[in-house]
Amino acid sequence: MATRCSHGDVPVASLSRLSRFGLAPFPLGFFSAGLVASYMSEFISHAARAEIEIQALEVQVDNLYGMEGSLLRGTMTGSALPVEATFRVKTTGTDAQNVQLAHLAVASSPADTLLRNAVDSVFTLNHNGTELPVTRVAASSRKQQLDPTAVFQAAQPGQTADFADNILQRLEGVDTLGGERLGTVRSAAVGLSDEQKRQVHVRGVGTLRTDGMKELQVACFQPIGSVFRFLSDDSAAVGGVERAPSGLVYLSAGLSFCFMTQLGRYAHVAKHAMHSYQIVQDTSFSPPAALNEKGETPTCAAVDTDVFIGNAEDPEKTQTLLNMGEQTCYLHAACRSGIKTRIRLG
């Protein structure tokens, strides 16, 4: 299974501006929503295989990230800590069976392979229409994709009749998530300073609706952020109706948004004369449990990203921009770190 995310022609730092003011979901929120949805899909598949009826299902994921160092000195580095997944379930199975289903859900989750496999992401770099060799980051072995500008110019809203309305929505007046009040620290900025030492706590909580859709609520728990609702459905290939994006789509979108945010942040702080940046990002996963009848260990390929930079800087500074974007990205850090998910039943 593969997902492709293409983004581009975004003014520097504008990706973070909407989320800064709570008007749109923040990049890490997409990733957490995708992780929750993936765990839920796997739990549902394993329960069906065991002929266990699900009467209620809620999955909570807590992600912790860190950022420390100086952008201008090249020491700033993003980091990701182990994920905590809490399953709150009511089924026709025993407590022991519910515990087993939770562990199977995480073990077979294609999304979780991205965390536990410790794989360096790979890149190509295009500078003002000319492909440059990458330096500190790992190089992609594939041919660089074409400039995605034409794709954006031709893009039109989909006309799928069954697609749900309001798949992304800010929830007004909500200040609790997972039964706890959001944290006590408010962030006054998005970190556009040279020196950083911060930790970010993101929480996502998903519930299974009676119509089979997954309703996900996600917030930056610390520092405090707005609560957003995501709707998710599985692809038709695994029994879904495709009424909303799948977990892997949200996960992949979060990765690309986070990376682009870091590119924009570095360009802003380093005062790069960058007028455009675009990416084409491919993520590939082995099939989920619904299609994995042999119970083979799930795998994923390295996140593969083509980066297109338009600027008035020299090639060396453009290569540094890519290096620092990858180095400070919370989610590329998660991919290369080999994170184990901690599981519990609530």
Question: Language-model segments: what does each one mean?
Answer:
Residues 1-33, 44-253, 264-346:
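Extended beta-strand/beta-hairpin segments
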